[in-house]
Amino acid sequence: MYTRLLQSTTRLHPRAWDFIQLMRLDKPIGIYLLLWPTLWALWVAAEGVPSAKNLFIFVFGVILMRAAGCVINDYADRNFDGHVSRTRARPLASGKIQPREALVLFAVLVTASFVLVLFTNATTIWLSFGGLALAACYPFMKRYTFYPQVVLGAAFSWGMPMAFTAETGSLPPEAWLLYIANLLWTVAYDTYYAMADREDDLKIGVKSTAILFGDADRLIIASLQGLALLCLLLAGARFELGVWFHAGLLVAAACFVWEYHKTRNRKPMACFNAFLHNHWAGLAIFVGIVLDYALR
């Protein structure tokens, strides 16, 4: 139903679907993976009762910035995507959208996001420039380093300190435990994503943690996920979260075990499905946080 609704926009303009695909609005998994951790931080910062204004700002800010990230990513990869089986049909790689049009769209999305941030406070506004820098840099990192997933993790986690400053006007040291947890988790699930493209990436010279980790990939992913859970446990102790939060962590841990099992043969589709499955882990942790505050 969601996809059909998006496809109906072609009635408004024949190229609308191309731009929807460029922003990946037809594939909301990236929105979820960015949204859940941002909401973890917002709920914890507000002790379970975030303001309606901030909830609106961060939900729509996530949607806009994820779309902007996809646009600049495809712009950076436009000469690579045509050589990768999974990405060769993307609008920029296939020529349906021109690079100049993509840059204009990126500027519009970033501007809209910044307008939302203007309704917060000075600290959050200043922090937003760091998020923009990370989002703009990430797509180019795979040309120069085997750690682009770390930059992605930093970018995907940046909304968390912003949520704290928007809600409370301050950034307590323990908030960085949430940030580090999400960074580690992002590196883990995006390595699964990179494993799906590893053979194509090796041919075209693109770098990733999947290539760097080699045969130790699944073991390192499991270790990163374990460290992420440990950071969340420590953060939970500092923020005095209780049984429901810990129940959410247990569900997330079960998700990680399932992913480890399903990727034992390292088949590309299994790795891609493991990446997608992380949405449920993030949701479980969010539900745990919400229930922990709501049922006190």
UniProtKB/Swiss-Prot annotation:
Pathway participation: Cofactor biosynthesis; ubiquinone biosynthesis
Listed transmembrane segments: 29-49, 55-75, 102-122, 124-141, 146-166, 169-189, 216-236, 239-259, 271-291
Tagged with keyword Transcription regulation: no
Secretion signal, residue range per the UniProt entry: none
Disulfide bridge positions per record: none
Listed EC numbers: 2.5.1.39
GO cellular component: plasma membrane
Cofactor: Mg(2+)
The keyword Magnesium appears for this protein: yes
Function: Catalyzes the prenylation of para-hydroxybenzoate (PHB) with an all-trans polyprenyl group. Mediates the second step in the final reaction sequence of ubiquinone-8 (UQ-8) biosynthesis, which is the condensation of the polyisoprenoid side chain with PHB, generating the first membrane-bound Q intermediate 3-octaprenyl-4-hydroxybenzoate.
Protein name per UniProt: 4-hydroxybenzoate octaprenyltransferase
Organism listed in the record: Ectopseudomonas mendocina (strain ymp)
